[in-house]
Amino acid sequence: LESNTDFEQYTVQITQNSVEKNMEEFFRLMALSSDDKGAFLTVQNKEFFVDLALRFSATDQYKLFFMEIEGAKVAACICFSYEGTYLLYNSGYDPEKSSLSVGLLNKALTIQEAIRLDVKEYNFLRGTERYKYHLGASDRAVFDLVVSR
């Protein structure tokens, strides 16, 4: 990618003034990347994402990464930063740029940033998507615990 095109990966600051514009761009990429993600993006779920962005940005725990190629946003992902761990929450990319593996590279560059910042763990959270294993993930047991009286 570096040798073939002009690209940039960066984190955006989420504020009350910037949240709508940045999250709409994230939602666009998320919806483009799969029909399931597009269907998931109801008004209620979008409002939830915006609320998360504002709440966790206030404590610098929310990271919204965008990748641009020639000035156009082509991939994005959200990570939470918590107690020395980056937690990959959700992502999206433009499938027209899939030949450049922009979705995978967007995530790989967040791992690179985590290493640069001396983050101790990068957690892909639930799911067995193939890209997670391409980036070095290993399975962990995840348990649901229900406590009742």
What positions do the PLM features span?
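Feature representing long, continuous alpha-helical segments
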Residues: 47, 104-108, 130
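Short glycine/serine- and small hydrophobic-enriched flexible loop segments
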Residues: 51-54, 109-115
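Short, basic, helix/turn surface patches
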Residues: 10, 111, 148-149
